[in-house]
Amino acid sequence: MYFPGEGLVLAAGKVLTGHPWYGILSVSALMCAAICWMLQAWLPPSWALLGGFLAVLRIGLFSCWVNSYHTAGSIAALGGALVLGAVPRLRKHPQLRYAMLLALGAGLLAISRPYEGLLLCLPVAAALGHWLWARKNRPPAGALLRLSAAPVALIFTLGAWMGYYDYRAFGSPFTPPYVVDRETYATAPYFVWQSPRPEPAYRHVVMRRFYEENELAAWKRIQTGFLPQTLMKAAAGILFFSGIALLPPLLMLHRVLRDRRVRFLIVCLAVLSAGMAVQIFIVAHYLSPFTAAFYALGLQAMRHLRLMRFDGRPVGLGWVRLTVTICLVLGGVRLFASPLHLQIPQWPASEWNSQWYGPIEFGKERARVAATLERLPGKQLVIVRYSADHNPLDEWVYNAPDIDRSKVIWAREMDAADNLELILYYRERNVWLIEPDTRPVEVVPYPDSRALKCAGQKSPSTPALNYHANRAALAPTSAAVAPLAQAP
């Protein structure tokens, strides 16, 4: 359902290093470097370096942006940093390299978070337009043409590629994957002025629960309490980027709002606030194009805090040093949490905070089971049976890009006919049943899988058979079944 930026990063990691996570790690490193580069255009170099360091501590080491396969946050933050870092440089020194970096950043936003990227590009376009048409120091027409030709060509090339991508995937160059997903599954609208759609026919209960109980519930909360929900969204976003440790500089917010140095960044965040207020949902990566702007304003607040004096004493300097020290201590605590046997708060007690110190517990048990299955001889098919109250956010069913050639394939359990079709399609595989909500999680042979294959081969057009009568006669499908069934 997501735009192709994430897939490109994962594919690059897989092709170049053999593991997709290294693509995520590389983009996260580039993101932190780009944030530092952007800050150098707005703040003194020493403060820009501090900002890059804080970005590494807060979101570059432990957050869900680097410790998950959902990479849109890092990609869009990288793109936003390139855009906001190129704008002041381009105005001071109209050079092709800055124009290309701006176009590259806008392209990264388009393939990762296009809506929020548009919110960022609107004030950027307005500022550049004002510079080109209303300022006396604008470049000559010929120089402007040479300056803009290559960036415009880059943007048009990227747009054409995205149109081709959508056409090959969905039959229309103007139908992005996100639209297809929302029209197929979602009932809750995306913006506050829209109405819910009729409930579609879901093949799996867990899908219905996600779109009905999670998304539709969020829409209802917005309708009955717009202001408190908007304030909660704002607080959640601030806490993700700053945490408690970086909140003291916000005491200087009244001075930052009057600061000419960062006035344009304030306008950018005001546009973001308006765009997020009318949007139903918010997750940390929705704000990612504005990551560098967040840190720029936070650092400018720290600069004002540093100058604060009380009774002639520089108390602000102590506050700034204490803030940075707390960030360092928290980073060290998170790094050595396991050897120190520290209990880290987990979902759902700390949903938003866990996004910076993650990973959350989701996925750990699946990774253990997947590693066990990968060691078995032959190919495996895993059928996952969820309980009625399974958390829809704890998903076990996802696969590698080339599903049919994968060592292990994961699928949700369906009705008898669909299960038979699945098992017959992968008849050469060992078939297992996993119930993620049982403790301990066990991997056992799928009931009657061998009888299902035999019955399907004899009568493929009659799937509704009483397969469970032969369950007692089934033998393990491999010698590894017994120890798997006893796995803790």
Where are these regions (language model features)?
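Membrane-interface alpha helices of multi-pass inner-membrane proteins
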Residues: 11-12, 38, 51-56, 81, ...
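Transmembrane-helix motifs of polytopic, lipid-linked glycan transferases
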Residues: 19-43, 81-85
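Transmembrane-helix signature of polytopic, membrane-embedded enzymes
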Residues: 35-59, 77-78, 91-101, 260-267
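Hydrophobic/aromatic-rich transmembrane helices and adjacent perimembrane loops
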Residues: 72-75, 109-112, 118-119, 171, ...
